[in-house]
Swiss-Prot record:
ATP binds at G522, I523, S524, G525, S526, G527, K528, S529. NCBIfam families: bacteriocin_ABC. Residues 16-143 form the Peptidase C39 domain. Belongs to the ABC transporter superfamily. Its EC number is 3.4.22.-, 7.-.-.-. It is found in: Cell membrane. It is a multi-pass membrane protein. Residues 489-722 form the ABC transporter domain. Its main location: membrane. This is Mesentericin-Y105 transport/processing ATP-binding protein MesD.
Length: 722
């Protein structure tokens, strides 16, 4: 390991994108020190980051996977007395006495440490050893490349990747630019009208000419406003088309992501990216107009100003470096503030969505005040970040306005002296001053792109953390193997674990033949739900294979697989819309009214629907204006209408009374051609099936019929008898 204790050494700072990214952001900074640049999305996957964040073990495993040597240690402040201490390294801390977090320590000088905090509200800072020791848990991870290490760089989508989105709108952009240029030309003519009045019409008493020119200018202004309307209309159309291209592509990508993505992220973190996408849309629209329109106006008006008076024009050019300096001074602060604001907004959105979804529990626990105070704290934080950004933007705007006003004064000052020496007329001076606004406005627009492009860059980084997660259907076009009818479902020594914990599924093998009715039983946490999610390929086993007939699931198109194996989760979701719309979601093509009636009869929900005011047209709310049992039965009928050969019911009758459940099980047992896997807590179901698989600690410990397992007197018998 190489020692790099210099305080002045350049740090490749990388901030966390979401609340739980501090561990992978710290690792990303270490990797960047050794010239490897990977997205946080990639590192999250390697480190098995979950809702709780990244463990030290996860950081070690991720670094090892990237050909780095690691040495995690438990130490105290005496660590910093070592002369050959290798920097940088990762330190685990507890911030504010309650938040687990990571720092990257880059060096030490005297009593101060150079720290990089992934939380960009702190960023790169110096911290005394005493302060550091108050937060430090003593856990440190030293990371250095192996001899075989080679730097790698992951390709990311930059803002330039949106150029094709822009070029698709080229005809629209051309029309907008033409309309805007014509609007500007009319305004320039208006400025010369003022010069004509002062220098020509009034001194020469040209009343008739003045009337004709005035009426002509009024007509020109009518045309100008029509063109302004056309320009604004086309801008709205372009904004909507950009929204379709950017936001809908994001939504499409979200729907194609694997379940593991949603299992490790809060809903608000995903939803907040829509706001990020809007920042990109605004920046793209502004950039297009500035490149084609503002530059064009700048050239045209600049030429007119030179013709008016070259001396005044040279003075006007002073504005360019002055504006550029103001923009440059604010670049870094704006970048940090944009990121802070977006991250705070993401956390606030997450909390609001979670609390609204869990409002019944909040009320049941009488915890409204606690929930409110949590959101209140996050909202105040968001307002503080927004206020700091708005305040800084106001300061920058004030400086720009001061430059503009000062320039106007200087132009009038110098221009007045030129008038006094008869080098220009009063009308020319007033016209020049009026035209100057048409020069400085597009100039400001071009320079103001900095703020919007910075917002877009931050937003693009946040979007990248989603786009860089591969679609689970990425290789579907290469999947040419088809499912063989009446195939058995076979798991061969499969193992799966969440993160780096103990296996949730541990060396499981099983075979389920076509048409068989199976019950998976066991206590909570035994691995039943995880196993069936592996069977439908929501997750992929870390070792072993699952096959449908002769074909491994990994070689099958996931759309085709999930059309063959239908999974009904523990908590069925009812969507806003009518009962009929909910029933037909995912239904096989060509579903008839008879099929629907048959499905609701099997699910024992037909009578309930007919008693409702609008029958099948009854509108259901997202949260459900029906009972939990009715939800489960509608969801079951919906699953039956998919008409898949294999149906997995994950405790899908848990909210039903025993009598209704028995009727439904009787109906399902009559579906002799269908393979059904019941995940059950109630052992009444297990008495009806062909075979029972008993699970414990991720293993299948028993396999047999109800009678044989009772006679064996094992774990199943113990569960049944109790």
């Amino acid at each position: 390991m190489v020692k790099t204790p210099m305080f002045h050494k350049k740090i490749d700072y990388i901030s966390q994108v979401d609340e739980r990214d501090c561990g992978v952001a710290a690792l990303a900074m270490i990797l960047a020190h050794y010239k490897t640049r990977l997205s946080l999305a990639k590192l999250r996957d390697l480190a098995k980051t979950d809702m709780e964040g990244t463990t030290a073990l996860g950081i070690v495993k991720a670094a090892n996977a990237l050909d780095f040597e690691t040495m995690p240690i438990q130490a105290d402040l005496s660590l910093f007395d070592k002369k050959d201490l290798p920097y940088p390294f990762i330190a685990h801390v507890i911030k504010e006495g309650k938040y687990p977090h990571y720092y990257v320590v880059y060096g030490m000088k005297g009593d101060q440490l150079l720290i990089a905090d992934p939380d960009n509200t702190v960023g790169k800072t110096k911290m005394t050893k005493a302060h550091f020791n108050e937060e430090w848990t003593g856990v440190s991870i030293f990371i250095a490349p192996n001899p075989t290490y080679k730097p790698t760089k992951e390709k990311k989508r930059s803002l330039t990747s949106f150029i094709p989105v822009i070029t698709r709108q080229k005809l629209l952009v051309i029309n907008i630019v033409i309309a805007a240029l014509l609007v500007t030309l009319v305004s320039i003519l208006g400025s010369y009208y003022l010069q004509g009045i002062i220098d020509t019409y009034i001194p020469n008493n040209m009343k008739n000419t003045l009337g004709i020119v005035s009426l002509g200018l009024i007509f020109a202004y009518v045309i100008q406003q029509l063109l302004s309307y056309a320009r604004d209309y086309l801008l709205i159309v372009m904004g909507q088309r950009l929204s379709i291209d950017i936001i809908l592509s994001y939504i499409k990508h979200i729907f194609e992501l694997p379940m593991s993505f949603f299992a490790t992220r809060r809903t608000g973190e995903i939803v907040s990216r829509f706001t990020d996408a809007n920042a990109i849309i605004e920046a793209l629209a502004s950039t297009m107009l500035s490149v084609f329109l503002d530059l064009g106006i700048l050239v045209i008006v600049g030429t007119v100003l030179v013709v008016q008076n070259s001396t005044l024009f040279l003075i006007s050019l002073i504005a360019i470096p002055a504006y550029a300096l103001v923009v440059w001074l604010f670049m870094r602060p704006f970048s940090k503030m944009n990121n802070d604001q977006m991250q705070a907004g993401s956390m606030l959105s997450s909390s609001i969505i979670e609390d609204i979804n869990g409002v019944e529990t909040i009320k049941a626990l009488n915890s409204e005040a606690t929930a409110y105070h949590k959101i209140d704290h996050e909202f105040v934080t968001y307002l503080e970040k927004s206020f700091v950004y708005a305040k800084t933007e106001a300061v920058q705007n004030a400086i720009k306005s001061l430059l503009q006003l000062s320039l106007n004064v200087v132009i009038l000052w110098v221009g007045a002296q030129l008038v006094m020496t008869n080098k220009i007329s009063v009308g020319q001076l007033i016209t020049y001053n009026a035209l100057l606004g048409f020069f400085t406005d597009p100039l400001q627009n071009i320079i103001n792109l900095q703020t919007k492009l910075q917002q877009a860059s931050v937003a693009n980084n946040r979007l990248n953390e989603v786009y860089l997660v591969d679609s689970e259907f990425k290789d579907s076009h290469q999947m040419t193997e088809k499912i063989t009818p009446n195939s058995s479902l076979v798991a061969d020594h499969i193992t799966y674990k969440y993160g780096f914990g103990a296996p949730a599924i541990d060396d499981v093998s099983l075979t389920i033949t076509a048409g068989e009715k199976i019950a998976l039983v066991g206590i909570s946490g035994s691995g039943k739900s995880t196993l069936v999610k592996l069977l439908v390929n929501f997750f992929q086993p870390e070792s072993g294979t699952i096959s449908l007939g002769p074909t491994p699931l990994a070689n099958l198109d996931k759309h085709e697989l999930r059309g063959h194996i239908n999974y009904l989760p523990q908590e069925p979701f009812i969507f806003s819309g009518s009962i009929m719309e909910n029933l037909l979601l995912g239904a096989k093509p060509g579903t008839t009214q008879e099929d629907i009636i048959r499905a609701v009869e099997i699910a024992e929900i037909k009578d309930d629907i007919e008693k409702m005011s609008q029958g099948f047209g009854t509108e259901l709310a997202e949260s459900g204006n029906i009972s939990g049992g009715q939800k489960q039965r509608i969801a079951l009928a919906r699953a039956i209408l998919v008409d898949s050969p294999v149906l997995i019911l994950d405790e899908s009758t848990s909210n039903l009374d025993v009598l209704t459940e028995k009727k439904i099980i009787d109906n399902l047992m009559k579906l002799t051609e269908k393979t059904i896997i019941f995940v059950a807590h109630r052992l009444t179901i297990s008495q009806r099936v062909d075979r029972i698989l008993t699970m414990q600690s991720g293993k299948i410990i028993e396999d047999g019929t109800h009678d044989t397992l009772l006679k064996a007197g094992g774990f199943y018998a113990s569960l049944f008898n109790h």
